Amino acid sequence: MLQRAASNAYSWWWASHIRTKQSKWLEHNLQDMEEKVKYTLKIIDGDGDSFAKRAEMYYRKRPEIVNFVEEAFRSYRALAERYDHLSTELQSANHMIATAFPEHVPFPLVDDDDDDDDDNPKKPPKHLHLIPSGTNIPQVPEVPKKEFKSQSLMVLSRKEPGVLQSSETSSALVSSGLSREEALEEIDKIHKGILVLQTEKEFVRSSYEQSYDRYWNLENEVEEMQKRVCSLQDEFGVGGEIEDGEARTLVATAALSSCKETIAKLEETQKRFSEDAGIEKERIDTATERCEALKKKFEIKVEEQAKKAFHGQESSYESVKESRQIDLNENLSNVDFAEKIDELVEKVVSLETTALSHTALLKTLRSETNELQDHIRDVEKDKACLVSDSMDMKKRITVLEDELRKVKNLFQRVEDQNKNLHKHLTEANSTAKDLSGKLQEVKMDEDVEGDGLNPEDIQEEDTVEDSDSISNEREIKNAEEIKEAMVIKQSRDQESMQEEKSETRDSCGGLSETESTCFGTEAEDEERRNWRQLLPADGMEDREKVLLDEYSSVLRDYREVKRKLSEVEKKNRDGFFELALQLRELKNAVSCEDVDFHFLHQKPELPGQGFPHPVERNRAESVSISHSSNSSFSMPPLPQRGDLKRASEQEKEDGFKVKFAGISDSLRKKIPTVEEKVRGDIDAVLEENIEFWLRFSTSVHQIQKYHTSVQDLKAELSKIESKQQGNAGSSSNTALASEAKPIYRHLREIRTELQLWLENSAILRDELEGRYATLCNIKDEVSRVTSQSGATEVSNTEIRGYQAAKFHGEILNMKQENKRVFNELQAGLDRARALRAEVERVVCKLEENLGILDGTATRSLSKRMPSSAGKPRIPLRSFLFGVKLKKYKQQPKQTSTIFSCVSPSPALNKQCSYIIPPAKLPEYVKRS
């Protein structure tokens, strides 16, 4: 690691002036990006005039925009990798030029790029074969292992001794005000400081990589456990929930146990640091004795001062520890207890960073001590050849004294940092033990727990608490300020969310229970997100270790909410079918009552009870009777005065009575009977079956198309892999990777289409179940109205035996047909799942080979970047002790109608799309 840090002394400044001006690869990427930007802008500029359009923009267009962001990130990453490759090649060429012609190259600058890790420092440059063989080329200097010398010292070592001596007597520089000797010392000092920082950076990076790997391992374990829980709940139809008190206790216990484990590891590391520091102290003492043997004189004031400072630090530590114990002896509420745990977690994270810095400092001390001992050894070897009172010997002893002083100062820093680390570890350990003991004694503070009710009340309560608490504790004040800002921001967000929910409720007009559940979940998530954004961003990645149990509880709650939403949607669907049946029955009953009503309404207007006034004799009168079949009859025109005699009028009156009686009998005959009602229901089911078969055949036909596309893409991918094995090289790999990216995008599109197909198939399954329930209801109705007597004539409310048997046969045939359709649909689902699994496997393989991140990893990476908006983190306090949302005034309930459940919210279909249909057949298939 030290060698890799020291190898960064070479410069890439020369390579920064060279750029690729013409590149087909770059042109292709820019053109592709321009097209994607235009398409994305077109999506963004679309207007959502209605709720349906806004829902479509959110659930259809939003994934496309997310996909564009992912593709843009991958393109940027490819450009960065290409630039890194070119920079490495140019750096190698510049290194070769500097080695061949050192007198023509100025001193290089300090290199910050630590990615150039040459595993073999003795390996010659790549392009030395281009130099003529007769050229006198000096050898490349090796990277020093025990000491680090700057590039300027390496160049000066090639010069003649006379030139070096003449340079020592040069005049002071005007710009810096230093002589050449002082400048060389300053350069050497700065290079050593750079080496220390680079070493510390390497240790921090290695620790970060280990923590990052462990974080994703824990993430995968949590996902596997959640999948296991969901599968068991779906299999047995049960749902287990943990009580709030038990959940808080578990989360607090897990957080404290994680802190204790980390503190124990840090204590072991600190003990090892102490042992290493003792070894280095012995080596420094040995070097001091050897230097005293050369000089016969040494002072120890620094060590005494260090001891006095150490005693002062111990006394201050005891006072801090006592004050800490006094603070913890007070009664803690829920919020105070959560804040104490947060402070402990932040302190443990900072201690981990301090331990890494201490490791790098100890490494630097070891290297400096080795350099000092080598220098003393060289002086002792040359002591016999030099005169004791010569100027050269005095200068070398003076240099040894300076180096020894630097090493002692560095050792003093190591000692101070080690003592400070030990002090903070002891304090953190005692705090963790005290919090563990007070875990069961924490009082439930309901007033503070409901911090989402009223921001003004919370501010007043905070003022009272500030007056009662100790004013010197800045941590409590900071926590209260954060809480006030969080409450204000949360109230604003909740008001905006309430307005959005009211608009959604007005547009949908139903599903109030589902909306309230979704509103509560979204408000809670928003509060957690706001609290996490207000926390400091230092050490957040390491904090995920402690908050992993919180994340699992949040994920469990999220799954439970999804399950409840699916149950509500299923109930609404069942209610829709029941309402449809009731609506059909009511429609038939209303038609019968309508006929009776019109028949009774026309009776007083019969000619026997009185004709209208003779003034209306010139106008033709007509009587219309409304019916669902649109049947009507017309009255003939009345006779004019003086045209007919009294006898003829009486005859026409009698004829009209007979005609009206015939019409009333025909209307009576058109009243639907029970048999006609059952026949109409069966015909309606048959029409629905025809429409369902059309959709089902189209859906099943798509599976074969997906299968053919996947096989073709796999064949093309195998060709590309064989071509890649035949042509080995970086340029060929880049070209083949560009050829494989369209296949990767096509596979991702197929995966998305398969997921949509599975969701649509789940809807078809629900329709089959509803149709089966309809058939069962029709069968029960037929059984109920079947005539038990063997009479030849039955009433309109009964069905003859042979007609009932005929109906039962038709219903049985439709049930068998329904079962066959279900089996075909189940086979299609199994085939689609297998095809989706195969596509997932191929996509994962491509992502590993091409270095492409999927959407989840890209979002995680973007959230981990400092420039991102911040990862939505979960506050420990919220899930330890819970929160209460602001109570809003209830909106006046709208009048519920039978059409309120006809169009469920599209958000439910989107949120419940993760539900996988059961592999077993439903009960109605078994019974049929």
Curated annotation (Swiss-Prot):
Residues 110-119, 457-468 have a biased composition (Acidic residues). Residues 207-309, 360-445, 547-574 form a coiled coil. It holds the Pfam family NET2A_C. Keywords: Coiled coil. Residues 489-506, 642-651 have a biased composition (Basic and acidic residues). GO terms for cellular component: membrane. One of its GO terms (molecular function) is actin binding. It comes from the Eukaryota. PROSITE patterns: NAB. Residues 108-144, 447-472, 489-529, 620-651 are annotated as: Disordered. InterPro entries: NAB, NET2A-D/KIP1-like_C, NET2A-D/KIP1-like_dom. Residues 10-90 form the NAB domain. Belongs to the NET family. PANTHER family: PROTEIN NETWORKED 2B, PROTEIN NETWORKED 2D. Plant-specific actin binding protein. May be part of a membrane-cytoskeletal adapter complex. This is Protein NETWORKED 2B. It comes from Arabidopsis thaliana (Mouse-ear cress).
